[in-house]
């Protein structure tokens, strides 16, 4: 195959982006060649053609984003190669360059993104120490986490619902195995070596300004280098890194996030969806962060609660505040798109609409007495109001983005174009009179430009200054010096409008960039106001109460499960009292009675209080917990080769390793994955260890043997779920009371589940026979006997 200059250009650029699908701009299409073309054809279901024996597939340039989305979602990295000059202005081969590399974590466009954060995670490891940096390129957010605990790192990666992992070569196999559905890319070690990247990106004189470890600084350098690589720019929109520290925030393992249904996942209804009545995209993202990172500083928690209380107490102004917030646009993402030169005219309109609300917002905020005034960039607002059309159509350069009156020069060229048709009509009429040809027409086409068309019957009347341009079957077309001059002016006007409007739009964007810091500060404050006002709205809507904090007391009166109550009629409220002396609760009762719901609701109420939310209870006095741990449900890890029992023991090992006297531990059916004898023994030993440790524990179990702990340890109290029997029917009241369950009601639960009557009746027969056998053998009924055999020996 003979290689043309165009193909040489393609191959040279492709060599630099071997691991990407290269979309190469050719006129009105982006083309892919060779193996890339086959992938594009298959994924996008478009025709595979050939050019000089090279497989080729193309997509229209104006539909790039919709096709790009499909390629990225299919797990491909895509390099966009654009024409860097107008074809009409270049007689040689058009200059082309890659303008961006698109990966799941480097997306900026609204049509690709949901309101939630789109996190890329850069993971590094050095001598057993892990560093993870989460970056949302669309908002500029950068979060840093360090740990010597590999599992803690994996938990955080899971909690953040990451879209992409970037890591050194040696970490890729294990991370790919742990997160098979996440796009994972390895980068060479030199990405981590240039710490000057950090200084340049943040304009620092001293790299230690951020107080990050050496490993964290290297990981931050790798992030910066990678974002520069994908965005093809030296100018980045990255906020200063925020350290996720256990000193400031509660660290939640992935089991707890899943077991308490904190955020959207595989389990359907969740706390985030219940609380998320936010009015802004920034607020929704911040609320999720607050849920995943509850505060551990009592003063900070109480400050949030006091603000929520102020908002609750002034419902009229709260409603007006939320109405105003509903008009706020996604300022964070707009600033990012402007910074990376990816903004569209609608972004500037959205920014203007947000800034216009600020004076009224400040007026309302002042009535609560707890908020500072939002900054108000009046000059920027004035520019946006004068420069950008209220409803811009098309792209910059098409003449419908910049307002009339902003640029006299642009208006002059627009006037010329707008009056062109009128001028042509006048010219046509003048020529008809001059020549006496009544059917003379003035027209235009893209090939020949403007022309005068005369039928062959009138050719004898044409003046000497008519220059022939084209001969048709029944007519001929001509040009005159005057029409040629008019055409030149019109074409120049079109070109100049395109150049001018693009330039003016760019200038406005540059002005927005100058206000980046103040705009991001406004966005941050608006997000906080939105979340706090949402928590106030939730408190009113769901009848929540303000929690009070104490040193060691946990007292909940009329507590409710915030998720279950939203989807259940007549939810049964429950009480709990624990303190430093009575801190371990064993809860027995049958399946379906509500043990699991109860212990989860205690965990959720505690967590909600520590994000600054009112809670679903009549009264709540709570300690500030450093961690909330959960061990619930039976699940295996087939991919990791771990049985249900091994998963259970791994989770318990984490709790025993990490819990302190300030932790809340919620256990549900620990020890059920092995034999009864082993299970009871392990559960008892774990209970002893947790009692000694001093943490607060709620342990829901079917092992009634564990209720004997109360006789040996004064810290233990027994609770059960009240069950009423009416004949052969049982009623689960879901009410937690003092005491011990005397029956498991397993057969009754099986009956409710729809097990056939013949099986239920047989189960009753076996139960009765075994009960008699045990009574004869032991001389009395033993509630703590070993598990009864199903069949007679």
From Swiss-Prot:
One of its GO terms (biological process) is mismatch repair. ATP binds at residues 589-596. InterPro entries: DNA_mismatch_repair_MutS, DNA_mismatch_repair_MutS-lik_N, DNA_mismatch_repair_MutS/MSH, DNA_mismatch_repair_MutS_C, DNA_mismatch_repair_MutS_clamp, DNA_mismatch_repair_MutS_core, DNA_mismatch_repair_MutS_N, DNA_mismatch_repair_MutS_sf. Keywords: ATP-binding, DNA damage, DNA repair, DNA-binding, Nucleotide-binding. Gene3D superfamilies: 1.10.1420.10, DNA repair protein MutS, domain I, MutS, connector domain, P-loop containing nucleotide triphosphate hydrolases. GO terms for cellular component: cytosol. One of its GO terms (molecular function) is ATP-dependent DNA damage sensor activity. NCBIfam families: mutS1 (TIGR01070), PRK05399.1 (NF003810). Belongs to the DNA mismatch repair MutS family. This protein is involved in the repair of mismatches in DNA. It is possible that it carries out the mismatch recognition step. This protein has a weak ATPase activity. This is DNA mismatch repair protein MutS. It comes from Thermotoga petrophila (strain ATCC BAA-488 / DSM 13995 / JCM 10881 / RKU-1). The gene is mutS.
